[in-house]
Amino acid sequence: MKPRTTEAPRKPVHRNTKRTGELSEAAFLLKAETLGFHLAKPWGDSDRYDFILDTGPRLWRVQLKCTQVLRARGYDVQAIYSIYGKGKVGYTADDIDLLVAHIVPINVWYLLPIEAITPSKSLRLYPDIVTKNPRWEKYREAWHLLEPNQESRKV
């Protein structure tokens, strides 16, 4: 019998963006259900939102965006979708209620109400550093925004 040898640590696998998105959707499903929320997934991928999140008294249209690449000490999230013939368009309250950004390498979640991000099309999140203007940090792990008695509360 051969003695065991220690293997070199595995390098992280860089998946394509579609696979990363699928894994983030699975992680969101697990996280939300663990916190007591219920989720439904629309049939197909033609809607502007990825999930319907049920808090009891309210249904939220949730668009999930994930990012895994660190650029200039931050993570970029594009709050846009494509329309044939019109190009890239920013989300509005007619499209979604909540944009959820998943920072994959550190498993951090930002729950951003659409009113907070409109009309921005690009967000830069800095979960690892303190910034002078922490514009989005108040939405980091802000699961409390989904609680029934908190829906109208401003952050």
Annotate each language-model stretch with its function:
Residues 1-47, 52-155:
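Mixed-charge (Asp/Glu-Lys/Arg
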